[in-house]
From Swiss-Prot:
CDD domains: ASKHA_NBD_actin. Actins are highly conserved proteins that are involved in various types of cell motility and are ubiquitously expressed in all eukaryotic cells. This is Actin. It is an enzyme of class 3 (hydrolase). The gene is act. Its EC number is 3.6.4.-. It comes from the Eukaryota.
Length: 376
């Protein structure tokens, strides 16, 4: 492979798509993983109206569209929409011809095997990529943090995973996955706001609630204490201006993120992120636990709450750890929203990685199932 052809790195999240060129230190394009279909008939001729819109354009026209996310809980549920998002990524965002560049995609662990086979098939058959690779998101986050040992808590919009990695090897028996992440918190916040008399019902209005969550919500260090403070004073209240200039005030801004630690409020049986991380460490060999406790790496957009999430995590895991002498360290890099992409950029530009790609020739010989042999 010639040196000058940069590989394309695409981190297809359930909520946001991050795309760019290997070797760059940040993605060139970051846009919502959304396909929007018109709810109304266009009657004005010559306006260039389209049947469907993707990404930011869908977001800006959301008032007249039905928005769909083709990736749910890290698994692609609508391949036609997914193809549109990839087409948009290559031709509109990055402005490249996919047949000229190797493509690295990312995936959540413990995904159905058919998901990565179909990804492989589309990249080679629809987009004619010369080479392809799919990598586990949490492993890339660890690359980005410059470590080879650590336990990665990766929480995005659709799925939260905990992956322990020792000396560069993922420990598959201890991987934990919870299908609760940012989108569930957004839905929970919609419910909380509905109790206050603010109803958001359409797919477009849900995006407003997501914005409220990202701008106003935070993780309480002590949930019970915070509830008392919120009940007794208005010091925690913040206001938000809706697109129609109506202003709403929210006091208990810590309630929605609390679901990360107590999934039962969402009606889910799964444990919170703290307990899931602890359980994963306890599933690992006793000799490696100490290093995992000292290298808990956070990544993904749902770990980006402006205050409190790493302190709370530190407090909960220290309380669970078998001895008080155990040093618990939470690493929350400021760029963790994009650390999966950054890790992919590092990996795809390593000279030692170049023999790892699945080539078009190998695909033609073996078919989509080759992805299970070549990508771990």
């Amino acid at each position: 492979m010639e040196e000058e052809v940069a590989a394309l790195v695409i981190d297809n999240g359930s909520g946001m798509c991050k795309a760019g060129f290997a070797g760059d230190d940040a993605p060139r394009a970051v846009f919502p993983s959304i396909d929007g279909r018109s709810r109304h008939h266009g009657i004005m001729i010559g306006m260039g109206q389209k049947d469907s819109y993707v990404g930011d354009e869908a977001q800006s026209k959301r008032g007249i569209l039905t928005l769909r996310y083709p990736i749910e809980h890290g698994v692609v549920t609508n391949w036609d929409d997914m193809e549109k998002i990839w087409h948009h990524t290559f031709y509109n965002e990055l402005r490249v011809a996919p047949e000229e560049h190797p493509v690295l995609l990312t995936e959540a662990p413990i995904n159905p095997k058919s998901n990565r086979e179909k990804m492989t098939q589309i990249m080679f058959e629809t987009f004619n990529a010369p080479a392809f690779y799919v990598s586990i998101q949490a492993v890339l986050s660890l690359y980005a943090s410059g470590r080879t040992t650590g336990i990665v808590l990766d929480s995005g919009d659709g799925v939260t995973t905990v992956v322990p990695i020792y000396e560069g090897f993922a420990l598959p028996h201890a991987i934990r996955r919870v299908d609760m992440a940012g989108r569930d918190l957004t839905d929970y916040l919609m419910k909380i706001l509905a109790e206050r008399g603010y109803t958001f019902s359409t797919t477009a209005e849900r995006e407003i609630v997501r914005d409220i969550k990202e701008k106003l919500c935070y993780v309480a260090h002590d949930f019970e204490q915070e509830i008392q403070t919120a009940a007794q004073s208005s010091s925690l209240e913040k206001s938000y201006e809706l697109p129609d200039a109506q202003v709403i005030t929210i006091g208990d801004r810590f309630r929605a993120p609390q679901a990360l630690f107590h999934a039962s409020v969402l009606g889910l049986e799964s444990a919170g992120i703290d307990v899931t991380t602890f359980n994963s460490i306890m599933k690992c060999d006793v000799d490696v636990r100490k290093e995992l406790y000292g290298n808990i790496v956070m990544s993904g957009g749902t770990t980006m709450f402006p205050q409190g999430i790493s302190d709370r995590m530190q407090k909960e895991i220290t309380a669970s750890a078998p001895s008080s002498a155990m040093k618990v360290k939470i690493i929350a890099p400021p760029e963790r929203k994009y650390s999966v992409w950054i890790g992919g950029s590092i990996l795809a530009s390593l000279t030692t990685f170049q023999q790892m790609w699945i080539s078009k020739q190998e695909y033609d010989e073996s078919g989509p199932s080759i992805v299970h042999h070549k990508c771990f």
